[in-house]
């Protein structure tokens, strides 16, 4: 089972919160104290809470569940995409479009348009268009890929969303809440933990911290998927003889 240790969190700077003047009082139970005007997060809470979240994600993946990684702020977007791709899951790394979950019917139509344009770009359709029309479709394709590329193969709503930066991604969290989709989120000292099923109190700005979260969640999803494949192989009679 994927777990993260206190040492790994300390090395990644997970315990460094925001400046004390920007704090959200709802995070008080998870704060150890302050140092040089910066809140220090109590990792005695974070370690078990994160490991519980990892176990949950692994369990979801073991049942063929879909995990949606969400992180659109600059510090998180690259790591979010890399982690989701590495475990064959889904991501939103550019901008959360309002209604991405709650208005899935419309989003699905946009995904269909994206896939149509992708086909046209490779089957020679673009070559038959005027230069101006081809340019317009290429721009539309790029725009749709940027917004929806990470969810174009999701085929339905996710079973859990994993969020870096609860404050920044409050719309995504609210949409998931409205649909009863569980939320796992990294919550810094300036954010509210409301509406989050699995709270991970921690630094949501430092690259090392972010990569620790995303890498661990990807590993948990992979491990869960591995369990699912092992069960499937056993059912299909493909178990190797010892």
From Swiss-Prot:
It comes from the Bacteria. One of its GO terms (cellular component) is cytosolic small ribosomal subunit. The keyword tRNA processing does not apply. GO terms for biological process: translation. Keywords: Ribonucleoprotein, Ribosomal protein. The keyword Nuclease does not apply. InterPro entries: Ribosomal_uS2, Ribosomal_uS2_bac/mit/plastid, Ribosomal_uS2_CS, Ribosomal_uS2_flav_dom_sf. Pfam families: Ribosomal_S2 (PF00318). GO terms for molecular function: structural constituent of ribosome. Transmembrane segments: none annotated. HAMAP family: Ribosomal_uS2_B. Belongs to the universal ribosomal protein uS2 family. PANTHER family: 30S RIBOSOMAL PROTEIN S2 PROKARYOTIC AND ORGANELLAR, SMALL RIBOSOMAL SUBUNIT PROTEIN US2M. This is Small ribosomal subunit protein uS2. It comes from Shewanella halifaxensis (strain HAW-EB4).
């Amino acid at each position: 089972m994927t777990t993260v240790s206190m040492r790994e969190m300390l090395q990644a700077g997970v315990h460094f919160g925001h400046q004390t003047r920007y704090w959200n009082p709802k995070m008080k139970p998870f704060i150890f104290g302050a140092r040089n005007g910066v809140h220090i997060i109590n990792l005695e809470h974070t370690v078990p809470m994160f490991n519980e979240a990892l176990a949950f994600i692994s369990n979801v993946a073991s049942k063929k569940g879909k995990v949606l990684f969400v992180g659109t702020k600059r510090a998180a977007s690259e790591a979010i995409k890399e982690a989701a791709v590495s475990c064959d899951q889904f991501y939103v790394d550019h901008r959360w479009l309002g209604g991405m979950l709650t208005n899935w019917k419309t989003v699905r139509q946009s995904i269909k348009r994206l896939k149509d344009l992708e086909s046209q770009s490779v089957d020679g359709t673009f070559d038959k268009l005027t230069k101006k029309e081809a340019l317009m479709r290429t721009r539309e394709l790029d725009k749709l890929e940027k917004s929806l590329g990470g969810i174009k193969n999701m085929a339905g709503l996710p079973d859990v969303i994993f969020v870096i930066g609860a404050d920044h991604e409050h719309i995504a969290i609210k949409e998931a809440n409205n649909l009863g989709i569980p939320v796992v989120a990294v919550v810094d000292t300036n954010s509210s933990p409301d509406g989050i099923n699995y709270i991970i109190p921690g630094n949501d700005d430092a690259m090392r911290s972010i990569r620790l979260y995303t890498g661990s969640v990807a590993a948990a999803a992979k491990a869960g998927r591995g369990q699912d494949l092992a069960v499937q192989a056993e059912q299909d009679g493909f178990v190797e003889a010892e």
